[in-house]
Each structure stands twice: as C-alpha cells, then as structure tokens.
Amino acid sequence: MGSPRPVVLSGPSGAGKSTLLKKLLQEHSSIFGFSVSHTTRDPRPGEENGKDYYFVTREVMQRDIAAGDFIEHAEFSGNLYGTSKAAVRAVQAMNRICVLDVDLQGVRNIKKTDLQPIYIFVQPPSLDVLEQRLRQRNTETEESLAKRLAAAKADMESSKEPGLFDLIIINDSLDKAYWALKEALSEEIKKAQATGHS
C-alpha cells in the first residue's frame, strides 16, 4: 500500500487554509502533523513560537538556507518564510502525514525535491470575498492589503497551470471545502490508519 504522501496546501492569504488545516488536525490529530514554518516576521498577537511559526532572525534563516536546511523558502512583504527539512522530518518521525502550508513559490521549489506530496490549492470564491475576509482580520494596512490582493490574483491565475496542483478547492463554504479536502485525502488517511496511526 505504501506510506502516505505528504500534503502541500497552498492558496492566498485569507482563502481559509489555516482554518481548514486546524479542522483537519483537530479531527485527525494522530494522522496528520503540521510542518511548522520558519519566518523572520514578528509574531502576531496570540501566536506562539514553535506552534504557529518558528520566529527567527533574518541572519539565522539566511545562514540555514545557505546551508541547504530548507526544502523551500520565499520572501513576502519584506519577510522570509520557509519550510525546514527538520520540521518535515519531525512530523514523519511521529508516523504522521506531514502537511505543509506554502505559497506558490514554495510549491514550485517542492516540485524540484523528492517529496512527492499531494498538491492542493485553496482559493476564495472571488477577490471581493477575499478582500472582505482580510479587512475583517484588522491586521492589514491599505498598502499591505493591496499587496496581498495583487499576490492573490497572481496566485489564482498561476494555480490554473496544468499539472501544478492535483486539486483546487474553492472555499465558499467552510463545510463544503472541508469535505472536499477530506475526500481528496481519504486514500492517504486509509493508508495511515492501515499502518497503525489510528
């Protein structure tokens, strides 16, 4: 049957990736493990180091990237983000399906590795809905909002590239989007349960 493949979730900020991911990890906590990314940005209120992100300095992160310790990394809004090999190995060491939350640049980088994950893109029903969601967060300035929306538009265009994603989920209703996500991962969930992660 083979061991379960990792899962790469991508999609614009505000599309609902984190919410879907939280639901998946809550419902199947012994099957899925989240690969915690590194970032050089400051923590937002309520974020914990080692749980939401590993918050590191630019110097440390650049040194580790140069040493080849990262599967993928990207720069956004002046901050570095990336997935370290150690973070993925830590999840796999617990016999869990590793879930990575990465941007499109990250997806392209992972395509060059031997990770062979399932690629899933989560997108909002429209850019208007996305703008509404981002405004409700109250964490964006007008400038950063415009940047995020421009990036989202570009991502949504690129996601149509043949062969880039195995599945595109349009998150117009959380329940429907979550059902589609679980459906897409049902084979991997079965494999994981068969190898004794129940």
Curated annotation (Swiss-Prot):
Catalytic activities: GMP + ATP = GDP + ADP
Inhibition and activation profile: Up-regulated by RD3.
Gene3D superfamilies named in the record: Guanylate Kinase phosphate binding domain, P-loop containing nucleotide triphosphate hydrolases
Predominant localisation class: other
Subcellular localization, as worded in the UniProt entry: Photoreceptor inner segment; Cytoplasm, Cytosol
Modified residues (N-acetylglycine): 2
Annotated active site: 44, 137, 148
Cytoplasm is among the record's keywords: yes
Pfam families named in the record: Guanylate_kin
Family statement: Belongs to the guanylate kinase family.
Subunit structure: Monomer. Interacts with RD3.
Protein task: Catalyzes the phosphorylation of GMP to GDP. Essential enzyme for recycling GMP and indirectly, cyclic GMP (cGMP). Involved in the cGMP metabolism in photoreceptors.
Protein name (database record): Guanylate kinase
Organism lineage: Eukaryota, Metazoa, Chordata, Craniata, Vertebrata
